[in-house]
């Protein structure tokens, strides 16, 4: 059996190696010729899987995408050919949640005020949005939710988008791309909606770039520097509008979900599904793939100080490093080369390929040397919190 896998998917050899021959490929440049002999195709969001890509293949047994979203997959086409498909919903939700939480701590540290005193609105309350809410609520932050798709079947309280914008100091976006219909999210934040943001609003986008009209965002941000931006996703990836980048407070190349646990979880979920399709038992464990936990002793009485919490979070992941590298890679390189799109493309994807996957909070085992209540740190995700 021939297994064709994106070169940036981790643990493919460890999980799929005894099922057949593995060939890794550049997912963004995948061609029908490369796919024609594959029995299994494993992709990420950079690969458009459709009739054109699979036009030369008549033996495909399974397509798996190690992603939450499926907007890059023509699921109707796969169904018409009876090709089993699976994605990995929720695989990197914890990573995205912690990324957004850390970004908010960074903004609070940079611009003053406390995150705990703010009201945060989450647009899209699925796996990733709920993970953000979990972190914030563990820390004691007031959270409001907007999600018209699930509000009728979900017991949580929801409000309209207009009300959320009017009431919230921070807005974090976690919706899939929907191009048409009642729940359209393409340019959900257009120029009018961007101009309706409260003074001093923090706006974070960790879902899809086109949820915000980036050209309108440039115009609004130039007129309203009070708005603070965290962008992990960009319209037109892998070629972000380079004039937008200097206007953004924290900028990264679509790596919010890039934790080691999240990436491993995505690959492992596809392994489980393929074994089910093949009628075989999944006899491998994800826990054997990951490095051991770190242990840190500290007096947790000091952590309620927000700067101390940020310091602890930076021990796991210092977002400033990726922000600095992103600006250097995209802006510095493009200024030296007339072929901006080519440079941005290479730099953007190269950053994603070479990204050192951070660990999630659970990888850090805290040993409490004080005598304070530590349940909130457990709820935030840290391991082994106790005395």
From Swiss-Prot:
Enzyme Commission numbers on file: 1.1.1.290
PROSITE patterns in the cross-refs: D_2_HYDROXYACID_DH_3
Parts forming coiled coils: none
Signal sequence annotation: none
Residues that, per the record, bind substrate: 45, 67, 258
Function description: Catalyzes the oxidation of erythronate-4-phosphate to 3-hydroxy-2-oxo-4-phosphonooxybutanoate.
The protein's assembly and partners: Homodimer.
Protein name (database record): Erythronate-4-phosphate dehydrogenase
Lineage of origin: Bacteria, Pseudomonadati, Pseudomonadota, Gammaproteobacteria, Alteromonadales
């Amino acid at each position: 059996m021939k297994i064709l896998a994106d070169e940036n998917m981790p643990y493919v050899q460890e999980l799929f190696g005894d099922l057949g021959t593995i060939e890794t490929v550049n997912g963004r440049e995948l061609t029908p010729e490369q796919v024609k002999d594959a029995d299994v195709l494993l992709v990420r969001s950079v690969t458009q899987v459709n009739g054109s890509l699979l036009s030369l293949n008549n033996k495909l047994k399974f397509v798996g995408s190690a992603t939450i979203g499926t907007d890059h997959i023509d699921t109707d086409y796969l169904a018409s050919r009876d090709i089993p498909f699976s994605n990995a919903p929720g695989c990197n939700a914890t990573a995205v949640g912690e990324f957004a939480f850390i970004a908010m701590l960074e903004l609070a540290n940079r611009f003053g005020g406390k995150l705990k005193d703010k009201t945060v609105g989450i647009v899209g309350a699925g796996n990733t949005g709920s993970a953000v809410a979990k972190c914030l609520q563990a820390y004691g932050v007031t959270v409001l939710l907007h999600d018209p798709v699930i509000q009728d079947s979900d017991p949580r309280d929801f409000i309209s988008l207009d009300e959320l914008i009017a009431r919230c100091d921070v807005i974090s976006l976690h919706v899939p791309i929907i191009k048409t219909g009642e729940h359209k999210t393409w340019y959900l934040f257009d120029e009018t909606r961007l101009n309706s943001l409260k003074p001093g609003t923090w706006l974070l986008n960790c879902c899809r770039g086109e949820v915000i009209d980036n050209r309108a965002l440039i115009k609004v941000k130039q007129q309203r520097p009070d708005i603070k931006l965290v962008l992990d996703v960009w319209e037109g990836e892998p070629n972000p509008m380079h004039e937008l980048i200097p206007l953004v407070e924290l900028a990264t190349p679509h790596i919010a979900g890039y934790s080691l646990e999240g990436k491993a979880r995505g690959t492992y979920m596809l392994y489980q599904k393929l074994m089910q399709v093949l009628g075989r038992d999944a006899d491998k464990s994800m826990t054997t793939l990951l490095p051991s936990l770190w242990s840190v002793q500290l007096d947790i009485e000091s952590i309620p100080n927000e700067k101390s919490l940020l310091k602890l979070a930076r021990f796991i992941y210092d977002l400033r490093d990726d922000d600095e590298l992103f600006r250097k890679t995209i802006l510095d390189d493009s200024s030296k080369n007339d072929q901006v799109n080519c440079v941005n493309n290479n730099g953007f994807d190269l950053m994603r390929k070479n990204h050192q996957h951070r660990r999630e909070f659970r990888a850090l085992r805290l040993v409490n040397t004080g005598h304070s209540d530590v349940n909130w740190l457990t709820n935030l995700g840290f391991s082994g919190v106790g005395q």
